[in-house]
Amino acid sequence: MGREIISIHIGQAGVQVGNSCWELYCLEHGIERDGSIPADRKQSSDVNNLNKDLGTFFSESTNGKKVVPRAIFLDLEPTVIDEIRTGDYKNLFHPEQLITGKEDAANNYARGHYTVGKELIDVCVDRIRRLADQCDGLQGFLVFHSVGGGTGSGFGSLLLQKLALDYGGKKSKLDFCVYPSPQVSTSVVEPYNSVLSTHSLLEHTDVSFMLDNEAIYNICKNSLDIEKPTYTNLNRLIAQVISSLTSSLRFPGQLNLDINDIQTNLVPFPRLHFVLCSYAPVISREKAHHETITVDNITSAVFSEKNIMAKCQPNLGKYMACCLMYRGDIVPKEAQKAVQNIRSEKSRNVSFVDWSPTGFKCGINNQAPVSTKDSEMAEVKKSVCMLSNTTAISQVFSRINHKFDLMFVKRAFVHWYVGEGMEEGEFAEARDDLLALEKDYESVSASTEGEEQEEEY
């Protein structure tokens, strides 16, 4: 019985994160850049054990000589995907899985969703269907995109709608979305694209993992001592998180979690499915020689605000659920002890809503993390990735909503969207939906606080 996953990479952010992910998966599974597995490695029982679950992410070519990623890369203009077509991994992907249009979305959700996107959508849906037909038991989709750009937001939403129509609730849709940074903006209309895109994510995805470049930039700068981190540095760190999250689907382990476990444990209410990620240890090669990495200190590190990959303050919110995905040389007893320590340290401000008293789900995968040769990150024997659903995430939405309101009250830039066939009413509808989302988070927080105060008397 297969448990295959199809990865869909959309727009510049999605495609570049995808590059880093597939580079890392190949390294972890001992796959060459052209998708072949060297003969000497094929004979080794270690490698066979490692590659037992390879079929989750890779399909085998007809002649059995190489493996091909179950992935599709989509962009409305060719430059970013052309880099894959000419890059180190050009022979890894099937040429039909790299799909490009001729003109870009110009940072405009409506171009990605209505005009330019419409021309490409049928080809994309057809390729995805073909990939799905090759699977014995498709588990679901991982979708990667940004919500600030035109392609990531507009075309991403269009594709998610099509997946919802074609596969309904039968297949999980996990979404990795890069949200705009509080300080750094790549385009003036980011707040519009983000609100319109989030409106679609609320309806058409099961879990959305939120990332933001500024938070990840700061982690690279402070923990890896990179003075001016590049997108490659950022994407390699994101790839480690995604690799941790998917390692239990790709390798054997003592306490493996599959996609459904992650979903069931992280999403208490269908709308509140936006999740924060943090990862530890993020440590440079120079420092690694002088540090002792214990399960206790990496567990403690993922609860620290400075290791969270989106800008928000978890100590101001309540946790509804929390998944700890350990990797490497770790036994369940150590993980349990580390979690107990977190619970008992009141000073940490790790507080849960009252209806989720246990709150923690742990997964342990025996496969240690690896780093690419030219990565600044040290290779370590153990790591942990935390996925948390906390009411603090509403801070991200209120920030974007505020920026949206400043422009929309003047109807600034709205004509660019209406000119591409969108109706102005869609802005108001999306904004109302996000206001309702903020209120949903508030009510979860408030009900807990109210009951806590009653207990004090």
From Swiss-Prot:
Mg(2+) binds at residue 77. GTP binds at residues 12, 77, 146, 150-151, 186, 213, 235. Its main location: cytoplasm. SUPFAM superfamilies: Tubulin C-terminal domain-like, Tubulin nucleotide-binding domain-like. CDD domains: alpha_tubulin. It is an enzyme of class 3 (hydrolase). Keywords: Cytoplasm, Cytoskeleton, GTP-binding, Hydrolase, Magnesium, Metal-binding, Microtubule, Nucleotide-binding. GO terms for cellular component: centrosome; cytoplasm; cytoskeleton; microtubule; phagocytic vesicle. Its cofactor is Mg(2+). InterPro entries: Alpha_tubulin (IPR002452), Tub_FtsZ_C (IPR008280), Tubulin (IPR000217), Tubulin/FtsZ-like_C (IPR037103), Tubulin/FtsZ_2-layer-sand-dom (IPR018316), Tubulin/FtsZ_GTPase_sf (IPR036525), Tubulin_C (IPR023123), Tubulin_CS (IPR017975). GO terms for biological process: chromosome segregation; microtubule cytoskeleton organization; mitotic cell cycle. PROSITE patterns: TUBULIN (PS00227). Undergoes a tyrosination/detyrosination cycle, the cyclic removal and re-addition of a C-terminal tyrosine residue by the enzymes tubulin tyrosine carboxypeptidase (TTCP) and tubulin tyrosine ligase (TTL), respectively. Its EC number is 3.6.5.-. It is found in: Cytoplasm, Cytoskeleton. The record marks 457 as: Involved in polymerization. It comes from the Eukaryota. It catalyses: GTP + H2O = GDP + phosphate + H(+). Belongs to the tubulin family. Dimer of alpha and beta chains. A typical microtubule is a hollow water-filled tube with an outer diameter of 25 nm and an inner diameter of 15 nM. Alpha-beta heterodimers associate head-to-tail to form protofilaments running lengthwise along the microtubule wall with the beta-tubulin subunit facing the microtubule plus end conferring a structural polarity. Microtubules usually have 13 protofilaments but different protofilament numbers can be found in some organisms and specialized cells. This is Tubulin alpha chain. It comes from Dictyostelium discoideum (Social amoeba).
